[in-house]
Amino acid sequence: MTLLVIGATGTLGRQIVRRALDEGYNVKCMVRNLRKSAFLKEWGAELIYGDLKLPESILQSFCGVTAIIDASTSRLPDPYNAEKIDLDGKIALIEAAKAAKVERFIFFSILNSEKYPDVPLMNLKSQVVDFLQKSNVKYIVFSLGGFFQGLINQYAIPILDKKSVWVTGESTPIAYIDTQDAAKLVIKSLGVPSTENRTLPLVGNPAWTSAEIIKLCEKLSGQKTQISQIPIGLLKALRRITKTLQWTWNISDRLAFAEILSSGEQFTAPMDEVYSILGIDRLEVISLEKYLQEYFGKILKVLKDITYEQGQQDNEISF
């Protein structure tokens, strides 16, 4: 089986590529920048140029492809409206998959996206899912909460650097998952017929609030942190401002997404059925506590070694 991965350089995409290669799949990666994607080629993947903003560049990537895994999304620095990638590009991708008679199309949505039509990113995801379901292309939609990896920059690093952690005062619990575990479940689903044309959650358990994550990071790092709260009213005001400027549309969309964090609704879902269908033991999926424990353990050891080496150098200079 040959897989085509879109968004292969991203946080989730690269883990999917690595897992697929480890499982013996042939992997093609549709990329915009061949130089920046060179590490994927070193792993054993084939790189093919393609850009979701240019539909005519997509179809050439589909030769010999059995299944598509689309892990792509627009980024804040991109100088165009997110709709260009997250809707138009996705529709072009699905149409190309249909023309190429691809056997399976895997797409990633966001938990509860159908409940927030006024939030651009959620609305775009819902529109793509709707189009995919009506396309006659066999699909799997995985609904995500968030990834452990994103919590490192948001909480762990500021705490280690003794800087303030910025939060929105949200009470929304989110079920995060390690991208390596997510990739394992995604690749596993390719060989399970009962996942066909299903929308399945892809989350960890339990769900965590910002306050709980900060408390855990403080415990594991042995450091207290200063918490700075961003008023939701300020986010709404910034959203209105950024929405008036074309080059800040993507920022406006992300600010709209941030507003829902104050809703209090849980971004989680039961995973029992998914584990059962895929034949996965839930104990194989790493918990946030263990993930952060391993992270802080490694970082604190490195810091300790650096401090020791600096102390030795100071002693030599003094002598």
From Swiss-Prot:
It is found in: Plastid, Chloroplast. Its EC number is 1.-.-.-. CDD domains: SDR_a5 (cd05243). Involved in assembly of photosystem II. One of its GO terms (biological process) is photosynthesis. Transmembrane segments: none annotated. Its main location: plastid. GO terms for cellular component: chloroplast; photosystem II. This is Photosystem II assembly factor Ycf39. The gene is ycf39. It holds the Pfam family NmrA. Keywords: Chloroplast, Oxidoreductase, Photosynthesis, Photosystem II, Plastid. It comes from the Eukaryota. GO terms for molecular function: oxidoreductase activity. Belongs to the NmrA-type oxidoreductase family. Ycf39 subfamily.
